[in-house]
């Protein structure tokens, strides 16, 4: 959680705790689908899917959730005692692509990815989308378990969602919280004065280190990437909606 004063409606990010930087760049939205790069997109119609109990959803998704450990350069410029941060990410495919938030890896000097098996492996940032606060990390590791990404075009206010991530980089595996989709198409102002659009609002508890982790539905499919919380309220968290990410992820994978 980013500390400091915030104006109303300006949520802090819920991941890396040191000097997040947001930039506004124009991006090229690739028309390619995620499936062209091997990312698991699933049927669009909920009627063709089977709702799972929450424990089954967790068992399905947890192997695809990673911890993102970073080391950055302090403001003084010296690398001695460089602050470390942590967040979460989600495995996109067996080729080692990991999706996370850009503010977790902005300005860092090294990235290490912790898998659900407990294995730590070096990662490198291969692409970024500054507008959506997304970044793509690549690792080399065997037996990766990609997450399934929902292809549903409509989410319903009130439907159950589950946030999975690694708050505080706690040992023993990822943390799970459950809530509902509270609202759709939210726009929020970042502490740096930029605006994120088309966000999902949820009351699933999001904590420091959850940034970059998935928000999933009762089918065990990713419907969003956790990105921010409202500092002046309780139980208001935000996630980037999957429909807003489809083309940017494909574009980043093509570049990375």
Regions found by a protein language model. Give the residues of each.
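N-terminal secretory signal peptides that target proteins for export/translocation
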Residues: 1-17
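Bacterial N-terminal signal peptides
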Residues: 23-36
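N-terminal activation segment of mature serine protease catalytic domains
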Residues: 37-78, 88, 97, 110, ...
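Conserved active-site neighborhood of the chymotrypsin/trypsin-like protease fold
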Residues: 45-48, 73, 93-171, 234, ...
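C-terminal cap/linker of serine protease catalytic domains
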Residues: 49-58, 165-169, 183, 218, ...
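Gly/Ser-enriched beta-turn/beta-hairpin loop segments
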Residues: 74-84, 126-132, 170-173, 184-200, ...
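Conserved hydrophobic positions within beta-strands
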Residues: 89-91, 123-125, 181, 226
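Catalytic nucleophile loop of clan PA
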Residues: 90-91, 205-225
């Amino acid at each position: 959680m980013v500390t400091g004063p915030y104006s109303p409606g300006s949520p802090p990010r819920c991941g890396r705790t040191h000097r997040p930087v947001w930039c506004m760049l124009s991006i090229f939205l690739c028309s390619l689908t995620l499936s062209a790069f091997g990312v698991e997109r699933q049927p669009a119609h909920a009627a063709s899917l089977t709702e799972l109990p929450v424990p089954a959803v967790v068992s399905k998704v947890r192997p695809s959730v990673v911890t993102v450990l970073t080391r950055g350069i302090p403001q003084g410029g010296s690398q001695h005692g460089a602050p470390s941060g942590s967040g979460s990410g989600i495995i996109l495919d067996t080729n080692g692509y990991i999706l996370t938030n850009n503010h977790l890896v902005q300005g860092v000097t090294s990235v290490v990815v912790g898998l659900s098996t407990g294995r730590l492996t070096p990662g490198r940032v291969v692409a970024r989308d500054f507008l959506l606060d997304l970044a793509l990390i690549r690792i080399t590791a065997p037996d990766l378990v990609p997450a399934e990404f929902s292809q549903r075009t409509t989410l319903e206010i009130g439907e159950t969602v589950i946030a999975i991530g690694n708050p505080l980089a706690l040992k023993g595996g990822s943390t799970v919280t459950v809530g509902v989709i509270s609202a759709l198409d939210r726009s929020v102002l970042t502490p740096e004065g930029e605006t994120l659009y088309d966000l999902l609002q949820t009351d699933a508890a999001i904590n420091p280190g959850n940034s970059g982790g998935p928000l999933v539905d009762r089918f065990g499919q990713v419907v969003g990437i956790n990105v921010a919380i409202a500092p002046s309220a309780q139980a208001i968290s935000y996630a980037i909606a999957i429909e807003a990410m489809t083309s940017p992820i494909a574009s980043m994978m093509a570049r990375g």
